[in-house]
Amino acid sequence: MQIQQWLMAKPEAQLDYPFGPDPAVFKVQGKIFALLFRQGDTDCVNLKCDPQQAIGLRDLFAAVTPGYHMNKRHWNTVKLDGTVPDGELQRMLDHSYTLVVRGLRLAERRGLEARHGRSALYGSEA
């Protein structure tokens, strides 16, 4: 699945299954930035999001809803049904990762920056 490859390509991304075989949990420095799971017959991903952007994305895409089993202000669930363009989905993945990295303790964040560079961690949000 392409989304799993995108998620694992993020610097120091780790895949974990703390809740059993579903969901697949993606972390950086022990902090979750994405959860990949099935809801019925559809693959979905939970992604962290700036609250204002979260609302805008929900208005723009029917496949984007408040985060399933998450803080609905800060997380969106995206149904991977093909209705969200790949470029937009990748931007959402990058944004989620960036928000989590920015929320890390200073020493953890600086360590990541030293090992990978700011552009690898923050992309266009650097």
For each of these PLM feature ranges, what is it?
Residues M1-A126:
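Charge-dense, helix-prone N-terminal extensions
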